[in-house]
Curated annotation (Swiss-Prot):
It is found in: Cytoplasm. This is Co-chaperonin GroES. Pfam families: Cpn10. It comes from the Bacteria. It comes from Bartonella quintana (strain Toulouse). Together with the chaperonin GroEL, plays an essential role in assisting protein folding. The GroEL-GroES system forms a nano-cage that allows encapsulation of the non-native substrate proteins and provides a physical environment optimized to promote and accelerate protein folding. GroES binds to the apical surface of the GroEL ring, thereby capping the opening of the GroEL channel. SMART domains: Cpn10 (SM00883). GO terms for cellular component: cytoplasm. Heptamer of 7 subunits arranged in a ring. Interacts with the chaperonin GroEL. The gene is groES.
């Protein structure tokens, strides 16, 4: 895992997509053009948390290294250090795997 020089703000996280299998269970190879973008990823950076109505910081439930599931249209695609990543709010994350 490369060390990125980027820290998201508030309740945002930086996610690296986890690539899916190139082959089906039956052995059929799926070409890149037919693949959907994976909705699974690994968190590589987290913000400090959002502020509540009283100005108190609310820490994030996810941490660096967590494997997550997120919605199909979640996040903003960015390129950091030549790597395609997603920046999304913690609320866009559906759950933590494992």
């Amino acid at each position: 895992m490369a060390n990125i020089q980027f820290r998201p703000l508030h309740d945002r996280v930086v996610v690296r997509r986890v690539e899916s299998e190139n082959k089906t269970a039956g052995g059929i190879i799926i070409p890149d053009t037919a693949k959907e973008k994976p909705q699974e990823g690994e968190i590589i950076a987290v913000g400090n948390g959002a502020l509540d109505d009283n100005g108190k910081r609310v820490p994030l439930e996810v941490k660096t290294g967590d494997r997550i599931l997120f919605g199909k249209w979640s996040g903003t695609e960015v390129k950091i250090n030549g790597e395609d990543l997603l920046i999304m709010k913690e609320s866009d994350i559906m759950g933590i795997l494992g």
